[in-house]
């Protein structure tokens, strides 16, 4: 039977994640179950007391076309290998989306295999770029302005200012960044900020180093100098630098010579087109058309 999770299910769900998502773990699973897991956001398939499948739907506030709206991210869709192809994923998705249709306009999903979710009305909407540089391609400025001493409230303020040029993004607050610190630490990463001459934070980046590569998973900046100072700091760490950004940011204009690879990040679903069209005074008929009403480029970098 399908039901909401209870506290005694947590251990079984945790072990399912550790087995099924082992290739992408890097400490994230432990962080997630310590800081983000909530039973009220979790569905399970219970077969005689054994948890054989699960998914989670975490609520967020999205800023969409000039207004904040409720949304959620579906993640952690998992079935025990021995119980696959029995329809459990489909049943869980139908149950979760039935509730989503009553609570929110748009639902997102992190999809390992996007083809599995098209039948539920999801379409590929969010993309990100991965830009590869050799350290010699990045000018290294003095990093006296780079600091590891950054506060959650400062980061939230910088993110809020940065996202004014975007649409379709999740709202972040101080509590988000307090958890973000824990996530970065759990996965072996670092976060540093850039301060101007007045000591004001004007950007930050989250990066991970492995062998010869510095991977900048998130870089948020209020001006070109902040971006260049942070990227230059990354170039002091390793021979290769990989910078992840939204697909709309014109990074090559700031830092030419990089090799750009675009990848799909998240899918989206409109839960009720009639209400959507009334609310936004449109006549859209599919997800792509719904997001095309946004007058600014999309930004999203939440996994949960």
PLM regions: where:
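Conserved acetyl-CoA-binding loop-helix of GNAT-fold acetyltransferases
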Residues: 76-79, 85-98, 109, 221-235
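Amide-forming acyltransferase catalytic core, primarily the GNAT-like/NAT-type
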Residues: 123-220, 224
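Residue-level detector of beta-strand face positions
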Residues: 42-44, 108, 191-193
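Conserved acetyl-CoA binding element of GNAT-fold acetyltransferases
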Residues: 69-81, 212-223
